[in-house]
Amino acid sequence: MESPRNHGGSEEEEYSSCESGWTMYIEDAFHGNDQSSVVVDDDDDDTQVKEADDGYENDDGDTSDDGGDEESDDSMASDASSGPSNQLPKHINKHAARKNGSKQVYLQKRQHTEKTISNEGEKSDLKARTRTSAASRVQSRGKVSKTK
C-alpha cells in the first residue's frame, strides 16, 4: 500500500494508517489537485456520491459535466457497498421510524409497568381488606360459639 501523502498541510502533519486511498483521492479532488467533479460525503452511516458543480459551462449553456448525451463513467466514484442515491431518503425515514418505534416501545413498557404497579397496589389493598374481614369473621364465630 502506498504511504500516506501530505496534501497541502505542514510537513509535520501525518495521516493515520487507517486512511484509505479513496480519502486521499477525494482530498486531492477537493483541494483542487485533481479535475474530478465527484465529491464523496462519508458520514458515520452511509457513503454518498454526488457530482460537484465546478462552475464551468458547456457549449450549450449547461453547467453539468456530462458532455451531452454521453454516459459518464463514475466507476471511480462509488464502490460496491454504495447503492443508488434514491435509496437514501428511504433509509432516513426507516431510521426515523425505528427511532420513534423504540420510543413507542419504551412508552408501552413504561405504561405496562405503571399498570402492574397499580394492579399490585390494588391487590395488596384487596389482601389487606380480606385479612381484616377474615379476622373479624373469626372473632364473630368465637362470640357465636360462646353464646350457644
From Swiss-Prot:
Q: State the name under which the record lists this protein.
A: Protein SOB FIVE-LIKE 1
Supply the alphabetized keyword list.
Cytokinin biosynthesis, Cytokinin signaling pathway, Cytoplasm, Nucleus
Highest rank taxon of the organism: Eukaryota
Protein's UniProt keywords contain Glycoprotein: no
Q: Which InterPro entries does the annotation name? A: SOFL
Q: Where is this motif: SOFL-B?
A: 75-84
Q: Where is the composition biased (Basic residues)?
A: 91-101
Q: What does the UniProt entry report for the null mutant?
A: Plants missing both SOLF1 and SOLF2 have reduced endogenous cytokinin levels and accumulate lower levels of trans-zeatin riboside monophosphate (tZRMP) and N(6)-(Delta(2)-isopentenyl)adenosine monophosphate (iPRMP), biosynthetic intermediates of bioactive cytokinins as well as decreased response to exogenous cytokinin in both callus-formation and inhibition-of-hypocotyl-elongation assays.
Under PANTHER family, the record lists: OSJNBA0091C07.3 PROTEIN (PTHR33347), PROTEIN SOB FIVE-LIKE 1 (PTHR33347:SF31)
In this chain, the stretch annotated as Disordered covers 1-20, 33-148
Q: What does the UniProt entry state concerning the protein's domains? A: Domains SOFL-A and SOFL-B are required for function in cytokinin-mediated development.
